[in-house]
């Protein structure tokens, strides 16, 4: 196994500043780092919290859990769970939630994890390597229609059909794909039109990673849960790194920061808005120059209001990852 690459946390100070903005000089209460990663945000939050503060972190990656276990601060605890399980925490118990979405540098730069077309390694792509199907497992059984749909839905790949047919043809002729280099070469051969400055396999790798890890569905679950677990005045801070993530976050905040209107009762709204949209922040030029991976980041900040609403029904409406994955042909355990 290769040594873990270095990870530079994007918008580290601005994100923690936004999270703790209303908390005073020695923040108490319970806070959540929903995506521990390598602990960049977690460590800064712990530096800022007062003695009565508590920080709970979530992560699916066993390597992230191992890193988190090195933190001996009694105010900190780690859960080996995806942040879609945020709703397991007590209602109204949290002073703030920080979500840093997507894949971390140690994950994408480790060939054995299979996230990148830049290195040859096993075609895995699972954030939690202890469970679930790898990308190779799924591609070994999915039909061309299922593969094409995933590439369209999660990669916005306009050559999805051609790539899917090439994957199935390769499987029938030579056996299933097992390595990242095999998939990258196959996509390069199938896609004749190049986007300037972008590897032709970029969208395919993104789509498979998002699908295998149910990333967008888990995000929807966590956002819905945030309405339930945040206390009034609690902050929601979300960092996204591509348009599919940011669209979900933007629409969620917009939907819950509008005053609902019931046509049947034109003189009164049935509930008040549940979120107050506060900010949209991009990394400055200095951060992008120091860390080019920050260039696509968008941070959105919202605050939970006093309003009560149908939080639990929102959580039920949030699309279940298993249901979405089943649509794309994955055989799920009972």
UniProtKB/Swiss-Prot annotation:
InterPro entries: RsmH (IPR002903), SAM-dep_MeTrfase_MraW_recog (IPR023397), SAM-dependent_MTases_sf (IPR029063). Its main location: cytoplasm. SUPFAM superfamilies: Putative methyltransferase TM0872, insert domain, S-adenosyl-L-methionine-dependent methyltransferases. Residues 303-334 are annotated as: Disordered. Gene3D superfamilies: Putative methyltransferase TM0872, insert domain, Vaccinia Virus protein VP39. It catalyses: cytidine(1402) in 16S rRNA + S-adenosyl-L-methionine = N(4)-methylcytidine(1402) in 16S rRNA + S-adenosyl-L-homocysteine + H(+). GO terms for molecular function: rRNA (cytosine-N4-)-methyltransferase activity. Specifically methylates the N4 position of cytidine in position 1402 (C1402) of 16S rRNA. Belongs to the methyltransferase superfamily. RsmH family. This is Ribosomal RNA small subunit methyltransferase H. It comes from Verminephrobacter eiseniae (strain EF01-2). The lineage of its organism: Bacteria, Pseudomonadati, Pseudomonadota, Betaproteobacteria, Burkholderiales. The gene is rsmH.
């Amino acid at each position: 196994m290769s040594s873990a690459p270095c990870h530079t946390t994007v918008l580290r100070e601005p994100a923690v500043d936004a999270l703790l903005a209303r908390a005073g000089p020695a923040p108490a209460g319970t806070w959540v780092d929903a995506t521990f990663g390598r602990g960049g945000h977690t460590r800064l939050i712990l530096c800022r919290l007062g003695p009565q503060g508590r920080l709970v972190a979530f992560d699916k990656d066993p390597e992230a859990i191992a890193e988190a276990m090195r933190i001996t601060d009694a105010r900190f605890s780690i859960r080996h769970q995806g942040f879609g399980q945020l709703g397991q925490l007590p209602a109204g118990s949290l002073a703030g939630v920080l979500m840093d979405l997507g894949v971390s540098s140690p994950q994408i730069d480790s060939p054995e994890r299979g996230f990148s077309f830049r290195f040859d390694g096993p075609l895995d792509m699972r954030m939690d390597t202890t469970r679930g199907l790898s990308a190779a497992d799924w591609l070994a059984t999915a039909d061309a229609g299922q593969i094409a749909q995933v590439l369209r839905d999660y990669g916005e790949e306009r050559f999805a059909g051609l790539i899917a047919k090439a994957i199935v043809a390769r499987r029938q002729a030579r056996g299933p794909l097992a390595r990242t280099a095999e998939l990258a070469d196959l996509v390069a051969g199938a896609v004749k039109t190049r986007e300037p400055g972008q590897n032709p396999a970029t969208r395919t790798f993104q789509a498979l990673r998002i699908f295998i890890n149910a990333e967008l569905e888990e995000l929807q679950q966590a956002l819905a849960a945030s309405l339930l677990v945040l206390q009034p005045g609690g902050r929601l801070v979300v960092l996204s790194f591509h348009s599919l993530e940011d669209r979900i976050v933007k629409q969620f905040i917009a939907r819950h920061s509008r005053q609902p209107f019931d046509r049947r009762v034109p003189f009164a709204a049935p509930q008040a808005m549940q979120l107050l949209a506060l900010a949209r922040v991009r990394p400055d030029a200095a951060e992008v120059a120091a860390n080019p991976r920050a260039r696509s980041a968008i941070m959105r900040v919202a605050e939970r209001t006093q309003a009560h609403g149908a939080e639990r029904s929102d959580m039920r409406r949030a699309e279940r990852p298993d249901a979405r994955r089943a649509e794309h042909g994955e055989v799920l355990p009972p």
